[in-house]
Amino acid sequence: AYLQLADKTKARMAFEQAAASNADPKIKEQAAYNYALCIHETSYSAFGESVTVFEKFLNEFPNSPYAEKVSNYLVEVYMNTRSYDAALKSIDRISHPSKAILEAKQKILFQLGTQSFANTQFEQAIGCFSQSVTLGQYNLQTKADALYWLGESYYRLNRMREAARNFNEYLSLTRQRDTEMFALAYYNLGYIAFHQKDYSTAENRFRNFVQLEKGENPTALADAYNRIGDCNLNVRRFDEAKQY
C-alpha cells in the first residue's frame, strides 16, 4: 500500500522493521526484498547503501526467488558507476555470487587491467587480465580480449614467450575476426618472430596482418611491408626483397 502511494520513506521504514522482526521467514524475505528496492530507488549515492543492502539480501536469502533480480540490480550498479575497485570488494563479500555477478567480476577485472595498462603499470595489468581469464567461462569474448591485452602487457615487458602464447590463444578463441585488434595480434606475432630471427614465421605473420589490415593503421601497414622485405633479405631472397 505504501509503495502504491509512492511514500517511499514510510515504506522503507515499514519494510525494514518487518525484515528485522521475528516474523515468518517468507514474510521476512519479502520485506527484505522490498526494503532493498526502496533503498535502491531512493539512494542518493550511485554506489552506496543499496549495494550493501543487496549484498545482505543475497547472503541471507541465497535461494530466494528474488535472488536473480537482486543480482541483476547489483550488476547494473557495478557496471554503470564504474567504481570497479569498490565493485570487486562488494562481490567478494557475497558468499554465493550468481553467474551474472561472476561475469560482471570478469568484466570488471578486464576494465581494471585496461586502466593499469593505460597507466603503463604492466605487471598490475597482467594480474587483472589473468584473473579475468580465469573467469573466462562466463563470457568467452571478454576472455579473448583479456588474452590479447595480456599479450600486449607481456610484450611491453619484453617477455616475448608469454606474449606470443597469449596472442595465439586470443587468435584461437576470439569470434571477432573483423577487427583491428585481430589484425594487430598477427603484427605483434610478426615482430616477436622477427626478433627471434625466425624469419619464415615472421614473414607469414606480417603477411597475415597485411591481408587483414583495412587501412585503419597506415603506419603499421607500411612498416609490415618493410619487415616482409627485411625477412626476405635475411634469408637472402633478394629478388623478393626488392618488391618491398
Question: What would you call each of these model-derived segments?
Answer:
Residues A1-Y244:
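Acidic, polar-rich low-complexity tracts and alpha-helical solenoid repeat scaffolds
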